[in-house]
Amino acid sequence: MTFENTLHFAQQLDRNDPLRSFRDRFLIPQAGGKELIYFCGNSLGLQPKAAREALDRELTVWQHLAVEGWFMRPDQAEDTPWLSIHKRCKDPLAQIVGALPSEVVPMNNLTVNMHLMLTSFYRPAGQRTKILTIGGDFPSDQYALETHIQARGMNPADVLVEIFPREGESAWRGEDICNAIDTHRDTLALVLMSGLHYYTGQVFDMAAIARKALQAGVPVGFDLAHAIGNIPLWLHDWQVDFAFWCSYKYLNSGPGGVSGVFIHQKHHNANLPRLAGWWGYDEDSRFAMTKGFVPMAGADGWQLSTPTVLAMAVHHAALQITAEAGMDALRRKSEQLTAYLEFVLRNSGYPLEIMTPADPAGRGCQLSLLVHQDGKRLFNRLVEQGIIGDWREPDCIRLAPTPLYNTFEEVWHVGQILLKFRT
């Protein structure tokens, strides 16, 4: 498509958008009675209108049934009781990440789940002790890896194999990651990295990485914090061993919302080491309170504690929206929306560098802009104009037009404001 930098063109794209009605399902932040241009779904997604209703339903159950809410619903409501509330989320989660329902479960928060997955899938033996990852991954992932390795009595410097972009480049080359797996195949115990980089916005070729790890006989896992709800995933078909994510970005499940994990079906009958808790115990006999852990089938057996019912209710309401829109349709709009943002940014003539890969297949909805002079000042001026993005030190502005609720007209306005700043 040939883009035009005009309001009429942007509005025409919006009129032709098959997902345009989904914006009405979200509460758009306002200032001075005017809707803000919110390009920060990569940090915190907007509140679905259905969230409050979902919360109210569970508060009503708590009000009228109290502890019995774990086992029944008022007036035979269709929703499952709290005892099985996580099951409400399994079908939409499976659809979004390309998995079987038995392979996914919502639980905990991301870094907790990362430690749980490391416990099960990092099994150093003999000379196979190393973990291959990318250098400069999200800090919480770095801290989790370092401290988990230390807790095993090992030195992170001896264990971690970090892959960086080449000198003078901001993006990783897929062949460098795959070649590193080949190079270290005899000493690797695990490959673990983000599926989409938080800072650059780069999408990694998870299918190729998983394929190479499988050939090397090394388990592979991905942090999908910035990938889930952003790009289509086929974790089961890719033979990914495990994955984990948060839900408060593109899934719009609220600040600190419920995380989740994927564990491939091939591991469900394996006697993997795990940290267990009573909510992962076989639900048919959980309340017998007997000694000895008997896990639930599938990923459910990795649950630890009683679920956070109110957060889970919002999570389910938000997941239904994403599942209804469909990841293929969301991706089609996202590619066009982000390409149009790139177009208007370049047309503005503002002195900035887009560090996110130009290839649509190599990025999600986020563009990371390097502003080498007065970047923080530009960011603050954008906020003053009602444009909400995200600032990352030392000189990066992240803008993420999100297909569920952002418009092409909003993108056009961002370009016009930058044009005004330049002149």
Question: Model-derived features: where do they sit?
Answer:
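Pyridoxal 5′-phosphate
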Residues: M1-T423
